Amino acid sequence: MEWRDEGALLSVRRHGESSAIIEVFTAAHGRHAGVVRGGASRKIAPILQPGAQLDLTWKARLDEHMGAFTVEPLRSRTALLGDRLGLAGLNAICAMLHVTLPEREPHSTLWQESMVLLDALDRPGWPPAYLRWEMRLLEETGFGLDLTRCAVTGSREDLAFVSPKTGRAVSSGAAGGWADRLFPLPLALLGQGPASAEEVRQGLAITGHFLGRELAPLLNGRPLPEARARLMELLARA
């Protein structure tokens, strides 16, 4: 078995004396793990940094085997090492892809959007794009939010809240006495105008709630990844 693909490195761990096991998110083969022979060597180890864009060739005797990668660097994202917020964003993306995606299942649209987001992390103003990316993650888990109309009245006007149970929008008038039990709906989630820092934080509280709920069987009682919590902490200070 053999294939060639492009992917971003999600994680790396040492394997034996000189090799490494990497996990990558690829364009056509999804989240995939494999051994890199000599991955702990001085020559290859510097290439294997989270977020690095790689040209990958995977080989295995049988498809169900872990197999081995040969890697060639396409793009390094080590510039983010000097940017605390950008690095936190990169780590959150890698961690969320790891816990969200089944192994070896292609998600081509998410892959394209993830690469665009990773490329944006060294420029200011990327947090709203991260919020939109988490919305896409929810869709990939099969639970996209429905913010097009009020769940109670069907109206498209005056949408002000999100139900924490259904993920559907609720208008201000329909919320009534339940308003304090609902999430405020930031305009950023509706794609209306530029997103303020507060709207991004509100939006991520919503996506975090539903991602945590939908991923609960995979997390086995654990919270969402610490890398995401670290990003939320830094955004709260911004």
Swiss-Prot record:
It comes from the Bacteria. InterPro entries: ARFGAP/RecO, DNA_rep/recomb_RecO_N, NA-bd_OB-fold, RecO, RecO_C. GO terms for biological process: DNA recombination; double-strand break repair. Gene3D superfamilies: Nucleic acid-binding proteins (2.40.50.140), Recombination protein O, C-terminal domain (1.20.1440.120). SUPFAM superfamilies: ArfGap/RecO-like zinc finger, Nucleic acid-binding proteins. HAMAP family: RecO. Belongs to the RecO family. This is DNA repair protein RecO. It comes from Cereibacter sphaeroides (strain ATCC 17023 / DSM 158 / JCM 6121 / CCUG 31486 / LMG 2827 / NBRC 12203 / NCIMB 8253 / ATH 2.4.1.). The lineage of its organism: Bacteria, Pseudomonadati, Pseudomonadota, Alphaproteobacteria, Rhodobacterales.
